[in-house]
Amino acid sequence: MNFLAHLHLAHLADSSLSGNLLADFVRGNPATHYPPDVVEGIYMHRRIDVMTDNLPEVREAREWFRHETRRVASITLDVMWDHFLSRHWTQISPDFPLQAFVGYAHAQVATILPDSPPRFVNLNDYLWSEKWLERYRDMDFIQNVLNGMANRRPRLDALRDSWYDLDAHYDALEERFWHFYPRMMAQAARKAL
């Protein structure tokens, strides 16, 4: 899962959106630096990452990647799941339009920015102003996201080519998304993530 899915599942679970978004920028035990609700959100994010990586649908999808891109398949798929969530938002969350949800999420996350790591603050500058969460529905934007990550981290250069794997298996990936994401939503609503 990437940014949008983590925020969405956090909302459904009544968990800290701030902690769920911040989690990738926090190493080790967050309890000494953040309030309990944010800490719980960080731990929820970590549980979701482990759970998602171990879902049969996700393990199957990783196998569809070519040898040269398989090592970045998990990262690529995380971004792709956000694409499907953004694309199908009106079906998934008919009572909370995406634009309104993004505004709500931004307001929640903004409360922790003064005490956040600089890299997280920098991400937030772009995430909200450039409307990443709304633009995930556009596959050209997904390609730009993958290229941007490859540019920032040369060891992830294979992300650039992983676009072709997404394109080749688009329909099958979308089908897998519909298999697992509604289950995750139900688990979030039961606070079982």
From Swiss-Prot:
Top-level taxonomic group: Bacteria
Top-level EC class: hydrolase
InterPro entries per record: ACP_PD, ACP_phosphodiesterase_gpbac
An annotated GO BP: fatty acid biosynthetic process
Catalysed reactions listed for this entry: holo-[ACP] + H2O = apo-[ACP] + (R)-4'-phosphopantetheine + H(+)
Keyword Lipid biosynthesis found: yes
Lipid biosynthesis keyword on record: yes
Keyword field: Fatty acid biosynthesis, Fatty acid metabolism, Hydrolase, Lipid biosynthesis, Lipid metabolism
Alphabetized GO MF terms: [acyl-carrier-protein] phosphodiesterase activity
EC number: 3.1.4.14
Function: Converts holo-ACP to apo-ACP by hydrolytic cleavage of the phosphopantetheine prosthetic group from ACP.
Family: Belongs to the AcpH family.
Protein name: Acyl carrier protein phosphodiesterase
Gene name, Swiss-Prot/TrEMBL: acpH
